[in-house]
């Protein structure tokens, strides 16, 4: 058994199918949010992750926008649509109301973070967007990007694994250069595993025991067809 994490698949069915097939039934899987929106397959991805045994699904900002949009007012629906929610809204509109309600109940129960200590004794904290001292501040755990610019805030022997900001965008913002669509490492304390699957056509699966990543390419799935 191994323990893996992935984030921000954003409706890319090719990425989820590759990762799903890579995972053994006994592997534990942490999904760090944002299964839906931008791409066409988000609802299917969300449902399959929710149904998978040995899995913790952490809430992302797109799950929150979906929840707010379906339970809220026109402004919440507009914000969700503006951020890529149209493909998800289209699928949900064709689902039975009872199925949508059941899905909303599952989303509402999603945690905002999870912790895992790997075999090397490293405490790994996983949230959608990053780390905050106040782990009750759910808004920061799904939206914050300011922690990229802060030094010395991570406790010793602790690693933050997150998504939310595609690594190409993050590196442009902080002036670092890595190959497009690859994982970002920050001095052994933070790992961003959002490789921007819906833009770069690359998705990441991080082994939390070894801290080694595996990259999946859309071109590989097309070649296999």
Predicted features and spans:
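Active-site neighborhood of divalent metal-dependent phosphoester bond hydrolases
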Residues: 38-116, 121-122, 147-148
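Active-site-proximal beta-strand elements of phosphoester/diester hydrolases
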Residues: 2-10, 123-130, 191-193
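Divalent metal-coordination and catalytic microenvironments
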Residues: 8, 34, 49, 60-61, ...
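Active-site environment of divalent metal-dependent phosphoester hydrolases
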Residues: 10-15, 37-40, 64-67, 134, ...
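Residue-level marker for buried hydrophobic side chains located in beta-strands
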Residues: 5, 29-31, 57-58, 125, ...
């Amino acid at each position: 058994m191994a323990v893996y994490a992935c984030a921000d698949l954003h409706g890319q069915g090719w990425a989820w199918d590759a990762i799903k097939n890579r995972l053994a039934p006994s592997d534990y899987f942490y999904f760090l949010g944002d299964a839906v929106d931008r791409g066409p397959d988000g609802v299917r991805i969300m449902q399959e992750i929710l149904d998978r045994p040995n899995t913790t699904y952490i809430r992302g900002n797109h799950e929150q926008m979906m929840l707010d949009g379906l339970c809220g007012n026109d402004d919440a629906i507009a914000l969700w649509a503006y951020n890529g929610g149209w493909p998800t809204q289209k699928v949900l509109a064709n689902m039975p109301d009872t199925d949508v309600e059941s899905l909303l109940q599952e989303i509402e129960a999603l945690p905002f973070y999870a912790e895992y200590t790997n075999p090397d004794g490293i405490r790994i904290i996983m949230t959608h967007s990053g780390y905050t001292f106040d782990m009750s501040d759910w808004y920061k755990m799904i939206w914050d990007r300011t922690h990229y610019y802060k030094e010395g805030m991570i406790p010793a022997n602790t690693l933050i694994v997150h998504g939310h900001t595609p690594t190409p965008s993050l590196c442009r913002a902080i002036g670092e250069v890595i190959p497009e669509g690859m994982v970002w490492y920050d001095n052994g304390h933070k790992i961003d595993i959002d490789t921007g699957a819906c833009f770069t056509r690359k998705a990441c699966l991080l082994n939390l025991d070894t801290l080694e990543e595996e990259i999946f390419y859309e071109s590989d799935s097309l070649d296999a067809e």
